[in-house]
Amino acid sequence: LYFFNFINGHVAATMDGDTKKKVFPELMPRTLYWFRWGAAWTWVTGVVLLIVIYWMGTEGFMPDDFTTNEANGDGPNMYIHMMLAITFLAVFLYDFIYKSKLASNVRLATVISFILIGAYVYTLKYCAGFEYRTFNIHLGAMFGTMMAFNVWFRIWPAQQKIITAIKNGEAPDGDLVALAGLRSKHNTYMSIPLIWTMITEHHSGTSLTGGGWIPYLSDNNNWIVLLIVVALGWHIVFQLYKKSAKIKGF
């Protein structure tokens, strides 16, 4: 992912047509093979772990009313099941937004996306009743689903046509180039928050999630930490893009 976004694009821009015609049909199918199957493997194993450890596990990660509440006999909390569905269906709203005219206004689309993410996390905590680790990993699952979708249903189909055009000595469709580039960039931006959700699963109850030394941070507002990490992760990627454009070859 980082090779494509921080290195490959800049190197490709220095190639002439004949070089691209020789290199791209040999290089890109090979790199994209490992790229897309790595994405598929990560998503499938992640979903399996989510089901086994969280949905079916006995560690108490899910709220008591995930199924019938044994304490009072009430039925399951439908907010939980609605939010689980949204976790894996939000990709279609994301795809709709970034196929619409709204995508041309990057700042507005980014703000709307962040607000929707905030609403999702807030609802997971206060309506579905998820604890930190549970809403943390479900946000990761949502990002991971979007990233895998981008790889298999947007980037790879577009790249197949782009590579074929270059191989035939033709100019690739500009819309396809833009689509593949945009979705790959989105995956790069989502990757940092996703990594956070995976590596901080054992930190529930520490200072970063409430109950530690950070003033005013408690279990009531620890969902804000996750949103700060999302924003910080996006900013880090933004700075990495700027840095990658300044690194030159010999």
Locations of regions flagged by a protein language model:
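Polytopic transmembrane helical bundles with strong interfacial aromatic enrichment
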Residues: L1-F250
